[in-house]
From Swiss-Prot:
InterPro entries: AlgH-like. Belongs to the UPF0301 (AlgH) family. It comes from Pseudoalteromonas translucida (strain TAC 125). This is UPF0301 protein PSHAa2600. It comes from the Bacteria. Disulfide bonds: none annotated.
Length: 185
């Protein structure tokens, strides 16, 4: 199977796992060893400013960025933060995932979020979604997910409550017409 990096996994309406129900997961890494992604539409009850206070990083509460929700990126290592952001170089642990999206895991990006040095657009997730070798491929065969090339507008410009619907609309068909069982139309 080709790499699904820089793609969205869109949870099928029949998804039973409550964590992933109506989830849109951005795939950051996918290779023969497994996959890693961040759910981009599951806000949690903490703002960026509150998170920065909790980890003792100075921040400007008057900035809109301090009021933005943090997201549950997945059930793995929920104490670890990941910042998906528009391209901005200079952070110590950044990787370009596409021409429009970078991921940074270092504290220097967090310190910049409520300043003029912040990336133009960003979301923070706590935790990530991980799949062992062959696990994601099996879930795809089991009809748990739909796949589409990622669109940064869904991550950064679409209101969180509309991200699943917007991703589904990119598929070009009515998802309610799909059979919940693999191999059946």
């Amino acid at each position: 199977m080709q790499s699904l990096e820089n793609h969205f996994l869109i949870a099928m309406p029949s998804m039973q796992d409550p964590f992933f129900k109506r989830a849109v997961t951005y795939i950051c890494e996918h290779n023969e060893d497994g996959a890693m992604g961040l759910v981009i539409n599951q806000p949690i009850n903490i703002t960026v400013g509150e998170l920065l206070d909790k980890i003792e990083i100075d921040n400007d509460k008057t900035q809109q960025a301090a009021q933005v929700s943090v997201y549950a990126g997945g059930p793995v290592k929920t104490d670890r933060g990941f910042v998906l952001h528009s391209p901005k170089h200079g952070y110590s642990a950044s990787q370009a995932l596409s021409s429009d999206i970078m991921i940074t895991t270092s504290k220097d990006v967090l310190a910049s979020l409520t300043t003029a040095q912040a990336p133009e657009q960003f979301i923070i997730t706590l935790g990530y979604s991980g799949w062992e070798q062959g696990q994601l491929e099996q879930e795809l065969l089991d009809n748990s997910w739909l796949i589409i090339k990622a669109d940064p507008k869904i991550i950064f410009d679409t209101p969180v409550e509309k991200r699943w619907e917007k991703a589904v609309s990119m598929l070009g068909f009515d998802i309610s017409q799909l059979s919940p069982e693999a191999g059946h139309a």
